Amino acid sequence: MKHLTPKETWALIQDQPDALFVDVRMEIESLYVGRPPGVLMIAWYEYPDLTPDPAGFVAAVDREAHGDKSRTVVLLCRSGKRTLDAGVSLEAAGFTNVVNVLHGFEGDLDDNFHRSTVNGWRHDGLPWEQM
């Protein structure tokens, strides 16, 4: 798995428009907090049980990739943690070009327990939208 900063990820997506850009957060998270435009929503887990479904996740990504396991799959979550597990599952299923977005959409907590102030997609000033 490759690990890229948000800015490196944005450059990759611009250079590879056929890459699958997947947000693994729950839909409600992205609605409240925001998300990059054009990102695919494929949750790693869902409310209320919050239990990951690796097989379901891999199957959903595989459908979007039309079975092309060499297609670049870029994974984004809140802070870059869920994407690690999701990426491992994709690699175990044979995907060969998996990218984890370091620090995720909101980034790490600062000293006051706030996000988007230290690092992450929003912090870096990259395009995002809120529904």
What are these regions (language model features)?
Residues M1-L20, E27-T72, T83-M131:
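Rhodanese-like catalytic fold shared by cysteine-dependent sulfurtransferases
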Residues L76:
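Short, surface-exposed ligand- or partner-binding patches at beta-edge/loop junctions that are enriched
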